[in-house]
């Protein structure tokens, strides 16, 4: 897959992630019950002690993470690509931790949260693939491939 296609995939994933995290952030601040689907217990997850980190909703952290990744996709510098990969891998690790908490501490699953974890995992893979394939010149810049 070309870098251009990988970038397009990353943009789509980041936009979907923004939608999911945005919805969960909205649900948090409005205090409404989320549409959870069959077999899920979003309310239990979203009101658990792991729904906030130092008073900040984890959904808002996800929203910031997806927005950061999306923004970096339009910057033509190696540092932006490295930053996007780093944010995606931190998001992956944090999502894995939260999924563990869902399964073994909260004893409930939030399909929206799992969807976000899957999206962040895919973004980590796509961004790492782009980074590993990226040609660099002596100035550290990566040629922008549309």
Q: Can you say where each PLM-predicted feature lies in the sequence?
A:
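Membrane-interfacial helix-loop segments of redox and metal-homeostasis proteins
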Residues: 1-146
């Amino acid at each position: 897959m070309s870098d251009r296609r990988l970038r397009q995939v990353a943009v789509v994933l980041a936009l979907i992630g923004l939608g999911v995290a945005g919805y969960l952030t909205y649900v948090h601040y409005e205090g409404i019950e989320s549409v959870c689907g069959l077999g899920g217990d979003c309310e239990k997850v979203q009101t658990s002690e792991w729904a906030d980190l130092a008073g900040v909703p984890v959904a808002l952290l996800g929203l910031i993470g997806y927005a950061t990744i999306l923004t970096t996709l339009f910057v033509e510098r190696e540092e932006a690509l490295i930053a996007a990969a780093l944010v995606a891998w931190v998001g992956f690790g944090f999502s894995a931790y939260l999924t563990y908490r869902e399964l073994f501490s909260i004893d409930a699953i939030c399909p929206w949260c799992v969807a976000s974890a899957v999206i962040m995992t895919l973004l980590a893979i796509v961004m790492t693939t782009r980074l590993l394939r990226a040609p660099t010149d002596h100035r550290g810049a990566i040629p922008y491939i549309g």
